[in-house]
From Swiss-Prot:
Family the UniProt entry places it in: Belongs to the heat shock protein 90 family.
Cellular component terms per the entry's GO annotation: melanosome; sarcoplasmic reticulum lumen
Keywords noted in UniProt: Acetylation, ATP-binding, Calcium, Chaperone, Disulfide bond, Endoplasmic reticulum, Glycoprotein, Hydrolase, Hydroxylation, Nucleotide-binding, Phosphoprotein, Sarcoplasmic reticulum, Signal
Gene from which this protein is expressed: HSP90B1
Species the sequence originates in: Pongo abelii (Sumatran orangutan)
Name of the protein in its database record: Endoplasmin
Modified residues (Phosphothreonine): T786
UniProt cross-references to PANTHER family, sorted A to Z: HEAT SHOCK PROTEIN 90 FAMILY MEMBER
Amino acid sequence: MRALWVLGLCCVLLTFGSVRADDEVDVDGTVEEDLGKSREGSRTDDEVVQREEEAIQLDGLNASQIRELREKSEKFAFQAEVNRMMKLIINSLYKNKEIFLRELISNASDALDKIRLISLTDENALSGNEELTVKIKCDKEKNLLHVTDTGVGMTREELVKNLGTIAKSGTSEFLNKMTEAQEDGQSTSELIGQFGVGFCSAFLVADKVIVTSKHNNDTQHIWESDSNEFSVIADPRGNTLGRGTTITLVLKEEASDYLELDTIKNLVKKYSQFINFPIYVWSSKTETVEEPMEEEEAAKEEKEESDDEAAVEEEEEEKKPKTKKVEKTVWDWELMNDIKPIWQRPSKEVEEDEYKAFYKSFSKESDDPMAYIHFTAEGEVTFKSILFVPTSAPRGLFDEYGSKKSDYIKLYVRRVFITDDFHDMMPKYLNFVKGVVDSDDLPLNVSRETLQQHKLLKVIRKKLVRKTLDMIKKIADDKYNDTFWKEFGTNIKLGVIEDHSNRTRLAKLLRFQSSHHPTDITSLDQYVERMKEKQDKIYFMAGSSRKEAESSPFVERLLKKGYEVIYLTEPVDEYCIQALPEFDGKRFQNVAKEGVKFDESEKTKESREAIEKEFEPLLNWMKDKALKDKIEKAVVSQRLTESPCALVASQYGWSGNMERIMKAQAYQTGKDISTNYYASQKKTFEINPRHPLIRDMLRRIKEDEDDKTVLDLAVVLFETATLRSGYLLPDTKAYGDRIERMLRLSLNIDPDAKVEEEPEEEPEETTEDTTEDTEQDEDEEMDVGTDEEEQETAKESTAEKDEL
C-alpha cells in the first residue's frame, strides 16, 4: 500500500515538473519576440558597443535639442564681402561641387596638425581625446553628412571670428582673383584652398551647415548657418566630442549622391589619400560568421537525449556548443588612406601617377607639375624631400615680393608637421617651388621662432636650392623655353641678382632674345658657341621692346659685321647682366656704353686716325662751343653706319633704358644722392663721319663758327641723338621750338614771322530783342493757362455745391 502511495506521489511530481518546463519555454519565446527573435541584440561585445557609440556621437541633435538650440542661439549677420564671396563660390563652382569634401578634410588635417604641434610642449593637450583622426559618416535617413576630426577645435570666439568673417585679410584679394580667373576662362577650384575660404564650399552641396566644436580652453559650442546668417550657442548636450570638430551638412536634394558610400570613398581617394592622418568612413560589409544554434533546436535535441538513459552520464561531461554559418552585415570604420607618406618611400617604388596625385592633393592645384625631384640628403643633416615646379606661376607671384610668406615648403620633423610659414626655407626668387621636407635631426619641442634660427636649417636650405636648380636644369629644352621661361624667367633673373653663391648655375638657365633668330630665345651657352673667332665680349642692347633694341643706332655696325647681339627687353634684364661679371670667361659689353671696339687691320687703323684728324675741328667746336656743358666729349664713332650721331654713356653711367627705368620708380623723390650722381653724368657724343649732315657741318664751321643755323643744327642733332639713344629730354618745348625754326628755314620762311591773328567776331544785335519777345510770349501763355485752370476749378466747385 505504501509502495502504491509513493508511486502516485512520484507521478504527481513528474506532471508538475513538466508543466513548469513548458511554462519556461513560453516565457523564453515571449522574450525572443520582444527582441525581434535575434540573439545579436543581447551580445555584449565591447568592440561592437564602442563602434556603435562612435556612430551615435556623429548623429545630429534630436528634435527638442534643435528647438532649444534655435530659440536660445545668438544670431549674427555675415559681412557684406563674405556674402558676396559665398555667392561667387557657389555660382562659379556649381560644376565642380565635389571639391567641398577635399576642403573640409584639408581643414580637418590642419586642425590635427595644430593640436599635434601643441602636444609637443603641452602634455595635457591630448587628454580630451588621444586619437588623431578624421571620420566621415553618411546618414541617408536624415539626409546628413558628418565630417569629424579630433583636432584643436574652436572656442566660441573662434567660431564667430573664423567662420563669420572668413579670410578677413584675403577676402578682397580672393574676390579679385576669382573674377580675373573667370574672365580669363581659367579654373577657379584651386583658388578656394589657396585663399583659406574652403569652408564656404560646403554650401555648394548643403542648404544648412552645423559645426559642433570643442576646444580645450572652452565648452562645446554649435555654429549653424544657411549661408545668409549664422548663430552660435553652447551645446545643450555638453561635451560629446572630447576635443575637435564635427561639421554636419544638411544636403540639398540634388546633392543626395554624396550620401552614397562609394561616392564618398572615391572622393577621399581622389583628393585626400595623401593626408597625413588616418581618414575613416563609416561603412558596411558582409561577413560569414558562426553563430550558436537556435534554443528551440537545442531544446529539441535535449528532449530527445533525455529519453536515452546513457544521456545521464553525458550531461556530466562538458558539451561543445553547436554552431551554424550565417551571413551578416557589419558596420565599422574603414581606413581610406593607408599609404605610407610618399616622401618616406624609396623613389624607385613610387609611380609617376602617385607623384602627380600627391602634388594635386598637397598643393590644391588642378594641373600636373611641370617637374619634380624626390631625394634623400645625407651628411651634416639628413632629410627626405620632394620638390615640385608648378605648370603655371601662382597668382600674385611678385606682389609684395619678399615682404610676406613667399614659399610653399612644408616642414616636417619626424613625420610631425611643424609649419609652412618659414620665410627662408627657400630664397625669395624660388618662391614658386612647392614641396615637403622631413628631417629627423631637428628638435621637436621648441618654438617655431627658435627652430627658424637653427643652424641646420641653413644647411637644409642650401641643399634644397642645389636640388631645385638641378631639377630645373633637367627640364627638356622645348618645355623649358616654351613654358618654364615664360612663367618663371623673371625668378631666374632675380636669382642671378640676389644669390651670389649660385650665380654661375643660374646664369646657365638664362634665356634672351637675340639677333640670331627673329622669335626664338637663346641661352648664353649657345651664344658663346656662335661667337666669332676673335670676339672676346658678349654684346647686348637694352630697350623697352625688341623693335626698339634692334633699331637702335648702337647696333648698326655690329649687325652689319655679323656679330650677334642679345636684346634685353624686360626691366629686370639690365640689372641681371650687371650682376654677372662674366660668363664662360667672356665679359659682357653694353653696346650703348663706351668700350665697343673691333679688331682692325693696320690699314683700317691708319684710315680711322686720318678721319679723326680731319674731323678734329668739328669735334672741338661741338665740345667747346655748340654743346658746351651738355657733353663730356665728342668723338668719331666706330659703331654707327646709318645714323648721324649717338649719345653714349660711360662705363659706370646709365644707359637710356636704365635711366628711363630709374626715373619711373614710384619711390623716386629726386633726393637720392647716388641716383642724382648717375643721372647727372655727362655722355659722349659720337658722330658718323660718313653721314652727309656731319660732313656739311664740318664744311660750315670751317667757314663760320658763329653761324646761328649751324649752332641750331648741332643742338637739334644732340637732342635727336638723345631720343634715339633712349634718353629723355629735359626740355621738350625748347626742342619743339628748334624743330619749328629748322622747318621755317627749310621752307624759306622768315624765322621771325608771326602767326596771323584771328578776326574778332561782331555781336549779334537782334539776340536781346528776340529773347525779350520770347520771354513775353511765354509769360502770356502761362497767364492764359492759369486763367483756364482757375475757370475749371470754379466750375468743379459749383458742381459739388449743386450735388450737396
